[in-house]
């Protein structure tokens, strides 16, 4: 009986093994097909929504060309539209160089964070430590952290436009007096973070442009990003277009490199976005510098202020993002509540920054916790709120389906 039972068991086992293997194979194949189909559907939805938003924006604001770099769950996608140069009929590509405008400020913050990690700078230092000429002045007594977070007491947004040389620049800072107490309000300003970037370079005993182009960008492997576009890359440098449709590029100005002077491509800026989310390998100290930029120093009614970045706790709403990127928020003083001490590095947030020159408009937004974000480049300046709406709609189309 034992042998018979054993024989029956063996036969039963040999009968079921192929059936189980077949069932598993069918199940795995079905899951793979389903996953592939879902990924294809998601890619289709993404492309359709980007197409829709790009066509609407280009038609409404007469934008000649746009480039989108998008990361969804760690995977990069690129979409290009229109012309980089209307006269030459040159199409936009991932290698087209656009002006970033104030998105450049995120590189100034990165250099400073890197300098702090090297021990050459502290955000609690005052400006006069690096520029002795500013001793016994309001700005000289101001901490660097207040400069980079626009909370020093009120620099007007475009005050640098009237200055023509370093002598006039230092005289302006020396004679400046705050409009309101330090750390009481936020007033966005090129003069504030521009000086901060300038001091960051002084702390490392070098020139700002050289440090960005020879230290920061190579560390991030951003090979087509520049302060000064070299001669052999001018063919890839798009023309911007003003309200009259005339081709223009950014003019030199005081502290332009620090505040608004960097040019880049959608491929490079998507890599920059990926590095900020820890999705690509970069030098460990540079990675820590990128992460440290997302500490929260104070709160406005709309967002938490990091180093150059504005951060919105998830889940956020389109209304919050539009409010935080509105003209009023940029140009008018906003009451703040200090975080003492600053928050740890924030990941479960919508991180963003707008940027523009007279002929270009840019927007970057990413969510480290979701490994998702996007960059929009255009060779015409158009409203910040429209960039925000487009980005939110595009990312929502793939994340909530």
From Swiss-Prot:
The class C beta-lactamase family has a specific amino-acid numbering system known as SANC, for structural alignment-based numbering of class C beta-lactamases, or else the simpler name structural position. A multiple sequence alignment was used to derive a consensus sequence and then the consensus was numbered taking into account insertions and deletions. This allows use of identical numbers, e.g. for active site residues, despite differences in protein length. It catalyses: a beta-lactam + H2O = a substituted beta-amino acid. Substrate binds at residues 353-355. Belongs to the class-C beta-lactamase family. The gene is ampC. InterPro entries: Bact_CellWall_Synth/Modif, Beta-lactam-related, Beta-lactam/transpept-like, Beta-lactam_class-C_AS. It is an enzyme of class 3 (hydrolase). Residues 1-39 form the signal peptide. The active site is at 102 (acyl-ester intermediate), 188 (proton acceptor). Its EC number is 3.5.2.6. Keywords: Antibiotic resistance, Hydrolase, Secreted, Signal. GO terms for molecular function: beta-lactamase activity. One of its GO terms (cellular component) is outer membrane-bounded periplasmic space. This protein is a serine beta-lactamase with a substrate specificity for cephalosporins. This is Beta-lactamase. GO terms for biological process: antibiotic catabolic process; response to antibiotic. Pfam families: Beta-lactamase. It is found in: Secreted.
